[in-house]
Amino acid sequence: NLLKSLAEELRLNFGVEVDYISCDLTDPKAPEVLYDFCKHKEYQIDLLVNNAGYAIPSSFDQTPMEEEEKFIRVLGISVIALCKLFIKDMLDRGKGRIMIISSVAAYAPPSSIQTLYGPIKTFMNRFSEGLNLNYNHRGITSTAVCPGYTITNFHSASGVQNEMDNVPGFMKKDAPRVAEEAVQATLKGNHVYVPTKTFKVIVLLLKIIPHSFFSLVSSVLAPGRYDSK
């Protein structure tokens, strides 16, 4: 499977020990399964990366509530659960780093199509801020990484590749570069990090320009985006 092949690739290219486990984070028990796996293997987790996510390729009114609940669990509840489980061991050691992959969308008004995505990412930023407030003085820092459009299989796997295809080339960033910057920022203990200069400027504009303007633009551009699906 994909995880197995990726693990083997890392072993060959970097000469490091790599292990893996397949977990479905829509399952409420998955975070504990992952934690127990690490404890059984006696792995010491000094850096916890929360990177699972996807997008829903349909409008809010057309998406079953069951799917919305799964979405919230993967992007939100599972992150909280994993942090709660692993942070206890970090506190015992007096050190640890947590990376939470958020998004530039956390700073933008909610899209008229991706109704939940932006608000969940905004919550993740605030949650990360809360972790820092409570545990920074005990050697634990949490970094909310807020990338923009990154070239991965995220959009194709989520069924929203047409959205990525319409993004100007200069706004698309390579995943290795974004990942490297994110890891460096997390190890430094940055509380929030926006990769690349392009998206730093975008976030600055999102903070300065009234949200009502972006809401208007979104309402004009978004209708019909997924009508063919």
Regions found by a protein language model. Name each.
Residues N13, A108, G130-I140:
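Active-site-adjacent segment of SDR/Rossmann-fold oxidoreductases
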Residues I21-V33, M65:
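The beta1-alpha1 cofactor-binding region of Rossmann-like NAD(H)/NADP(H)-dependent oxidoreductases
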Residues N51-I56:
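Conserved NAD(P)H cofactor-binding loop of Rossmann-fold oxidoreductase domains
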Residues S59-D61, E67-I72:
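Substrate-binding pocket helix/loop in short-chain dehydrogenase/reductase
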Residues C83, P119-I120:
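Active-site helix of classical SDR
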Residues S103:
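Residue(s) in the substrate-gating loop at a strand-loop-helix junction
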